Design a protein with these regions (language model features):
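Acidic, Ser/Thr/Pro/Gly-enriched alpha-helical scaffold modules and adjacent low-complexity linkers
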Residues: 2-519
């Protein structure tokens, strides 16, 4: 590890080409409102990941942050025959106090985390020891505009060269002229095209980026929504153990419990994490989110190796890392995280999980990875009942031979409706205790879980609950809502609700008068 850190430090001191030494910084420095830096990483067979280009070159990353970015920008397991790029995302804790972040408008970004979008490419090269080279281009930002940042990297790398200094310089120069991000629509010129970005008032607005059921007139520059999920359920569902696992995962996440997504590639892992968090919106997941982690990651952020225990959702590809995280979580949190294995299976995706490993349609098996995996434990408690009509629709679409794009909208709309039904009784209860202060701000009386459960018992909920009898269903209902109200998610949702209501009453959420453009 010390050898690699020294290598990173030496690369940072290595002379840059003249045209990259002192980039012309247009004033104001608009790039810093959107991002921190571009980094090109190269996998050196002798020492591991190393930094090839840091642009702008004067960004004061700490050695520990550069090391974390380098390691996370490469797959831990990679097929040497892979010809297509991998696009994935990860986050690292900001341990670079000398980096000055900037964002004058809401959203202001995150001062504690760096959000990384990455394109990994593997190319044949007979001059290399392993006959191919591996490079990654990474965009580091303090804004979690994952889909938008992925699009920026796609435009920059589609020419066929992943480390072209001229492209880096041109991208930086154009972003330098963009107006700062703010709520609403932005039309942003970028390398010969217009990127249209829509920024919602809060990351947890549901159904971002989903087209309406009635097609509108085609826009010349289709919008990218800042917080829309990356990936698609049309792809992810083919790797699921069963369809009804969607409800298990939904329940785990809405109650702010821990989930580990295990996949063969960082792209599938990070896309699944993004898509899973989307289905519980507008409830913000209050745990730690790590779309992709490697063996060299900082585990204190998820309560391991000395950190404060926190719920988490993480994506990994390393079975040895899985065993380490599960053992540590069981030791510090007292419970095993739910494990979702995403892998190729024979036959169609079953509707529900078969508990026998020997059943002909069972997908309840260990992940097909070197070192094996850990057997999945069926959750001992479940409150929500699967919707049979939706499960049957998903099953029918999955059985079609042709490629489809209808699963994503179906799953996203169904779970958005389920979440709306779930939080409706809470909104109803809060409305009875709503007080407007003299300054016009919303204020709620102290929240009493027993009083709220009595309200749900009186007025009911539209959510379908498990149980053969009404008494069992009432028990499931009370257990579900009591668990939610005691979770971190409840407080993150309530904070979002109050903040948006106050901003709306102050006229800060009005419709924008037009698109913002680059200068």
């Amino acid at each position: 590890m010390d050898k690699i850190k020294n290598k990173i430090q030496s690369i940072r001191r290595k002379p840059l080409p003249d045209h990259l030494k002192d980039p012309i910084m247009n004033l104001p420095d608009g790039f810093r409102n959107w991002a921190v830096a571009f980094i090109v990483c190269n996998f050196n067979v002798d020492v591991g990941p190393e930094i090839e280009i840091l642009y702008p070159p004067n960004v004061a990353f700490s050695t520990s942050d550069l090391t974390a970015i380098c390691f996370n920008s490469f797959p831990e397991q990679q097929n040497t025959e892979t010809a297509e790029d991998l696009a994935f995302n990860f986050t690292v804790t900001n341990n670079s106090p000398d980096i000055k972040l900037n964002s004058p408008n809401s959203p202001h970004g995150n001062a504690d985390l760096f959000f990384a979008s990455c394109v990994f490419r593997q190319e044949f090269d007979d001059t290399m020891k392993r006959s191919f080279n591996q490079r990654s281009m990474v965009l580091i930002s303090h804004h979690n505009f994952t889909s938008f940042n992925n699009r920026i990297l796609q435009v920059m790398t589609e020419s066929g060269v992943i480390s072209d200094p001229t492209t880096l310089e041109g991208a930086h120069a154009q972003m330098n002229n963009w107006l700062p991000p703010s709520i609403g629509r932005h039309d942003l010129p970028f390398l010969g095209r217009i990127l249209t970005l829509d920024i919602a008032p809060h990351p947890s607005f549901p159904l971002q980026g989903l087209a309406g059921s009635v097609p509108l007139v085609a826009e010349p520059h289709p919008s990218i929504y800042a917080y829309e999920p990356v990936g698609s359920w049309d792809n992810i569902m083919n790797f699921m153990p069963c369809i009804t696992d969607l409800y298990v995962l939904y329940e785990k996440l809405v109650l702010c419990e821990s989930v580990i997504v295990v996949a063969k590639s960082p792209q599938l892992a990070s896309e699944a994490v993004s898509s899973l968090l989307d289905i519980i919106r507008p409830v913000p997941y209050a745990g730690v989110v790590k779309p992709y982690m490697t063996m060299q990651a900082d585990f204190r952020s998820i309560g391991i190796d000395g950190g404060t225990p926190r719920p988490f959702i993480i994506g990994i590809t390393n079975p040895f890392l899985l065993k380490r995280i599960v053992a540590a979580a069981e030791r510090t949190q007292g419970t095993r995280p739910h494990i979702l294995y995403l892998q190729n299976f024979d036959g169609p995706v079953p509707t529900r999980r078969h508990h026998s490993l020997h059943h002909k349609s069972s997908r309840n098996v260990l992940l097909d990875l070197p070192g094996g995996g850990i057997e999945v434990h069926t959750p001992s408690k479940r409150y929500l009942k699967s919707d049979s009509a939706t499960v049957n629709q998903i099953e029918s679409i999955l059985k079609l031979d042709s490629q489809t794009s209808s699963l994503g909208p179906l799953i996203r709309r169904h779970f958005a409706e389920l979440t709306a039904q779930f939080i409706a009784p809470i909104n109803r209860y809060l409305a009875t205790s709503n007080v407007v202060s003299p300054g016009g701000h919303q204020r709620y009386a102290s929240f009493s879980i027993p009083e709220f459960l009595a309200s749900v018992g009186k007025y009911g909920t539209s959510v379908k609950l498990r149980g053969q009898s009404s008494m069992q269903r009432h028990k499931s209902r009370d257990g579900l809502y009591a668990a939610f109200c005691a979770s971190e998610n409840f407080y993150s949702w309530l904070d979002m609700k109050i903040s948006l209501e106050n901003e709306a009453s102050a006229g800060l959420l009005g419709s924008p008068t037009g698109s913002k453009t680059g200068r």
